[in-house]
Amino acid sequence: MNQERVFKVLLGPHISEKATGLADGKSQFVFKVATDATKLEIKKAVESLFSVKVQRVTTLNVKGKTKRTARGLGKRNDWKKAYIALQPGQDLDFATSAE
């Protein structure tokens, strides 16, 4: 997998209360990923970008909410979320892996 596709697959970390609890307790991390990305692509992208071993990848599609505005109804974009479980003994550090 080339470096350009790695950055198109992983859009960024998803920060929430649940994601923070999973990262602290179970060594699982949550990412926003491209909607056309497969589990194998996500696994390879995380392993190459952060130099860790991935145990499991679980994905889900999040449907965009319908919102009311002054101009009528609007819809937020659909997006895909990936839960990344690392092998025991592995840890993901966002600060040093970006270098």
UniProtKB/Swiss-Prot annotation:
GO terms for cellular component: ribonucleoprotein complex; ribosome. It comes from the Bacteria. GO terms for biological process: translation. The keyword RNA-binding applies. Keywords: Ribonucleoprotein, Ribosomal protein, RNA-binding, rRNA-binding. The keyword Cell cycle does not apply. InterPro entries: Nucleotide-bd_a/b_plait_sf (IPR012677), Ribosomal_uL23-like (IPR013025), Ribosomal_uL23/eL15/eS24_sf (IPR012678). GO terms for molecular function: rRNA binding; structural constituent of ribosome. It holds the Pfam family Ribosomal_L23. Belongs to the universal ribosomal protein uL23 family. PANTHER family: 60S RIBOSOMAL PROTEIN L23A (PTHR11620). HAMAP family: Ribosomal_uL23_B. Part of the 50S ribosomal subunit. Contacts protein L29, and trigger factor when it is bound to the ribosome. One of the early assembly proteins it binds 23S rRNA. One of the proteins that surrounds the polypeptide exit tunnel on the outside of the ribosome. Forms the main docking site for trigger factor binding to the ribosome. This is Large ribosomal subunit protein uL23.
